[in-house]
């Protein structure tokens, strides 16, 4: 049986709804609104049955389509950062006073570098809280654990030890994802309160990061940067009205990843959007103040 591969809950829901010819699935609440210049789709998986169908843990997934903002180059950084920050703040709630931000992925492989690059733009304040000028700030620490092939240590193991030492209220993990559609690459951001499996975007699944493994809530920020070749082929054929595809013709293509040719520039820009979005969600700063602090 041919299957699309996607890490986006919104896409998984769309695919199953199309297959069953339904508006939504039992056990799933989904709605799309337009705010702050972009469409925001919220998918809440309420039951274990729905979670199994979608292949995603129970919880809330919020997907922002930033493509309308990216067409206006004048203030795209500010508007996109504000949009991400507002949705993340709503997801976190009011009780998170200290956060560990984890930039997951391989900084040396561009499509997988969104986590480490975003972490560079997060305002670190844990060591400044004793200073009266920063007493109202959220305590934020940052870690980029690298990948198993570089360190010999699972990201989960590194983060679990750090969580025990730092004792944050929550972890925010940033990582690359896979999409079913080229149109969503580097233009979509998924936020969730369900944790994340590092490396899923590039097909290298590692130990999951979740409340069960780290002991604190784990919020995930994911950006689709790749499409696997088999999924891309299925998507293109579907658009062309071809549904009778021989599964044998696609065998072996699941290990081939496709990304955009300007991925370096895309990651560089999106990393600032994600990093600044986290800062705006956590700190009592407006965008101009944040830019002054971050240089």
Q: What do the predicted segments below correspond to?
A:
Residues 106-138, 142:
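Glycine-rich phosphate/diphosphate-binding loop of Rossmann-like nucleotide-binding domains
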Residues 49-94:
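An N-terminal, well-structured beta->alpha segment
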């Amino acid at each position: 049986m041919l299957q699309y591969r996607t890490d986006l809950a919104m896409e998984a829901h769309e695919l199953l709804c199309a297959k069953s010819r339904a508006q939504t699935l039992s056990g799933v609440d989904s709605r799309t609104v337009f705010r702050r210049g972009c469409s925001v789709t919220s998918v809440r998986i309420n039951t274990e049955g729905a979670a199994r169908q979608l292949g995603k843990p129970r919880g809330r997934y919020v997907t922002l389509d930033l493509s309308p903002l990216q067409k206006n180059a004048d203030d795209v950084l500010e508007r996109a950062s504000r949009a991400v920050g507002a949705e993340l703040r709503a997801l976190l709630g009011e009780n998170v006073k200290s956060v560990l931000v984890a930039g997951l992925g391989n900084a040396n492989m561009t499509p997988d570098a969104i986590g480490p690059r975003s972490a560079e733009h997060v305002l670190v304040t844990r060591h400044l809280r004793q200073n009266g000028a920063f007493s109202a700030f959220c305590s934020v620490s940052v870690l980029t654990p690298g990948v198993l092939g570089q360190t010999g240590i699972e990201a989960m193991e590194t983060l679990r030890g750090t969580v025990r030492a730092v004792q944050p209220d929550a972890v925010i993990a940033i990582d690359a994802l896979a999409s079913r559609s080229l149109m969503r690459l580097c233009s979509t951001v998924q936020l969730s309160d369900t944790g994340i499996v590092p490396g899923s975007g590039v097909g290298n699944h590692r130990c999951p990061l979740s409340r069960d493994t780290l002991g604190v809530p784990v919020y995930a920020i994911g950006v689709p940067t790749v499409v696997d070749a088999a999924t891309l082929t299925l998507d293109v054929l579907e658009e062309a009205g071809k549904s009778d595809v021989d599964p044998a013709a696609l065998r072996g293509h699941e290990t081939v990843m496709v990304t955009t040719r300007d991925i370096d520039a895309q990651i560089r820009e999106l990393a600032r959007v994600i990093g600044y979005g986290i800062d705006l969600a956590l700190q009592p700063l407006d965008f101009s103040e944040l830019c002054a602090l971050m240089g």
